[in-house]
Each structure stands twice: as C-alpha cells, then as structure tokens.
Curated annotation (Swiss-Prot):
NCBIfam families for the chain: dapB
EC number: 1.17.1.8
Localization per record: Cytoplasm
HAMAP family, A to Z: DapB (MF_00102)
Residues annotated for NAD(+) binding in this entry: G13, C14, N15, G16, K17, M18, C90, T91, T92, S114, A115, N116, M117
Organism: Clostridium tetani (strain Massachusetts / E88)
Protein name: 4-hydroxy-tetrahydrodipicolinate reductase
Pathway the protein takes part in: Amino-acid biosynthesis; L-lysine biosynthesis via DAP pathway; (S)-tetrahydrodipicolinate from L-aspartate: step 4/4
Length: 255
C-alpha cells in the first residue's frame, strides 16, 4: 500500500472565484496538491482534471474541499461517505435541514465546517467567548457586516457565527434583530445584526459593545480573498486522517 506524504485535495467549485484563488495559493504549500476539481463546467485551463459530477471522478484524494453552493451538499456527502473521506465545507447559507444532515453525517465521516476560513476571524470569535460574559449586562451588542454586491446570503455566515458565540456564552436568552426599522425602542436582550452589500468589499465584520459613556469595537477586515484560501488549505491538511466527528477552526487552532 502506497503512503502519500502530500495532502491530495479534490476541490469542489474549482472554476469559481474562490476556487481559482485556492488553486493559486496551493502552489505555495509544499505538502498540498490539488489533484482534481469538480465544477458545473468541466472546461478549464487548470493543471488537474475537472469533473462535472463528483461521482464521475476516478482520481484518488485524501480530502474533499468544498467552496461551491449548498445545493452540492447531498452529492458531496454521498461521495465522501462512500469513500470514507474527510469533507471540508467552506460554503455558507445552509438550511436547517442541511445543517442537520451535516451533523448526522459527521457520525460516519470527519467533517470540517466553518462560516469563515480566516484565522483572524476565528481568533476574534474565540475572544468573544470571554468578552461577552463580562460585558453583556452593561453593554448593547450590535454586529455590522459588509460584503461585495455579488454575495447572495445575508446576514453573512460569519456574522451569525459571531452572534451565536455571544449568545451561547451568556446566561440570558438573547434575540437576534435583523436590521432596524419603525419606531420601537431597543430592548436589552437583543443582538442587532446588520448587512451591507456594495462594490467589491471582500469582507468586513464589526462587533460593537455600546455602553454608557464608552464603546468597544472589535473589527476584522479581509483585505484579500487569499486569507480564506489559505485557511481552507490549512484546514484540509489538518483533516487528513482524522476520525469521524465535527471539526471547526477552533479545533485546528488549538491542535
């Protein structure tokens, strides 16, 4: 049996904007190789074979990395379950049913899921676990996210990730308010989440703790999409050989 030191990745969504960036960034990793791609159009000038359907692939790999759309989920899960392969999900906008399917499938194969593959965002997310406990009583919490005008889901998966982290780490029940309109007064136990779409903004997230006489802002700005590509490639390398279960950026950063 051959032992491969390289991490061989099958990239789903390889012809998309992020897929192209991941392919470019992979050349800077000595231990990673993209050996095949999957995309709705198999026409490309990439250095590896591209298949329109993942089940058509005859190329062996160690990890399947998905940067496509939620509609691809069922075929990816079917393929990875059959091949016993780790699945790295970088797509956002999943329905509750799809999230339940991911959770259930992780009992049989290793699945890595993160709403944002940036290491910086995930460090901030980790900090929020402690900060929220100390500030929630005396500070109003608002989250503002900004993205390019081509992003279809809102609020962003990252904004929800940050909000969920705050909500899960305070004893009181917090409600999400998406945008604000009308004349109702802000209640105490809520997190305001606001989405802005315009131009070519890569990704901007601002968590605001507004108190009496002071305001704390924790902000992350993605300057280039390469930050997401690098995180996705590192996550793929991390997942090689992992046992079944759910994994996220915290697992990787703390390993």
């Amino acid at each position: 049996m051959e032992v491969y030191l390289m991490v061989r990745i099958m990239l789903v969504g390889c012809n998309g904007k992020m897929g192209r960036i991941i392919t470019h960034c992979s050349k800077d990793f000595n231990d990673i190789e993209i050996v095949a791609g999957v995309d709705k159009s198999s026409t490309s000038n990439l250095d590896f074979p591209v298949f329109e359907n993942i089940h058509s692939s005859s190329v062996e790999c160690d990890v399947v990395l998905d940067f496509s759309r939620p509609s691809s989920l069922k075929s990816l899960i079917s393929y990875c379950t059959e091949k016993k392969l780790p699945l790295v999900l970088c797509t956002t906008g999943y329905s509750k049913e799809e999230l339940n399917l991911i959770e259930e499938t992780s009992k049989n194969i290793p699945i890595f899921k993160s709403a944002n593959m940036s290491i910086g965002i995930n460090v901030i997310n980790s900090l929020l676990k402690d900060i929220s406990k100390k500030l929630y009583k005396d500070f109003d919490i608002e989250i503002i996210e900004k993205h390019h005008n081509q992003k279809v889901d809102s609020p962003s998966g990252t904004a929800l990730l940050l909000a969920d982290t705050i909500k899960d780490n305070v004893p009181e029940k917090l409600e999400y308010i998406y945008g604000r309109s009308g004349h109702s007064k802000r209640t105490k136990n809520e997190i305001g989440i606001h989405a802005i779409r315009g131009g070519s903004i890569v990704g901007d997230h601002d968590v605001i703790f507004a108190g009496i006489g002071e305001c704390i802002e924790i902000k992350h700005t993605a300057i280039s999409r390469e930050v997401f590509a690098i995180g996705a490639l590192k996550a793929s390398a991390f997942m090689k050989g992992k046992p079944s279960g759910m994994y996220n950026m915290d697992c990787m950063l703390n390993s």
